[in-house]
């Protein structure tokens, strides 16, 4: 909570809470078989989000990802969020898992963020993974998706990347949160291209405060972005 305390003086409208995949640990059983166990050594996204909201009174936007989760896992997380009054969610595919060269979805999960958006939108209509429909209870999630002013690293080109974003909005996304970008001109150009493509939902620039010089090298490598020369110097 120390980091949140330092941000309070700026009166943030909301705080994003990222989602980290659980670690996988293999153990050897006495009979020589290998067992895989999912491990987590810190609180999860839902718990952290509720704690920040309740302790500081700041709106939170928990991230929810496809990676490592089945549709039922995702549904459980959404049920908890809805019960706790966490009604904003950023729907993402997520990064590759450990030792993965390419993204590998859970066998019962989603391959793309658009499918996650569809699942959340379905829950807003009272529709669940097993086909049951609850007419008396609909969740009220506001769904955010990621946009990439500098193109997603896996996209063929900027045009196809924008088409994917338009599809996510058409599937039920209420707003776009951009990938980290420190170039105002690039952000404005991206928003202009979104409007030309028929994407009329709000587009919120994503900015991460820089706290160390090392991040000037680490962030471009991690997020496939460019830093303006003025910022580097």
Predicted regions and their residues:
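Acidic (Asp/Glu)-rich catalytic clusters
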Residues: 4-11, 47-57, 78-86, 133-138, ...
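Glycine-rich, proline-tolerant flexible connector loops at the mouths of alpha/beta enzymes
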Residues: 6-43, 94-108, 173-190
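Catalytic cores of alpha/beta
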Residues: 70-83, 160-164, 189-195, 212-218
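Hydrophobic faces of well-ordered beta-strands that scaffold small-molecule active sites
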Residues: 1, 13-17, 60-64, 89-91, ...
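Active-site pocket-lining/capping segments in soluble small-molecule metabolic enzymes
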Residues: 94, 107-140, 145-154, 161, ...
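Flexible, glycine-rich active-site loops centered on histidine and acidic residues
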Residues: 71-122
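Active-site glycine-rich loop that binds ribose-phosphate moieties when present
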Residues: 154-171
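Generic structural signal for well-ordered alpha-helices
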Residues: 4-5, 45-50, 78, 114-121, ...
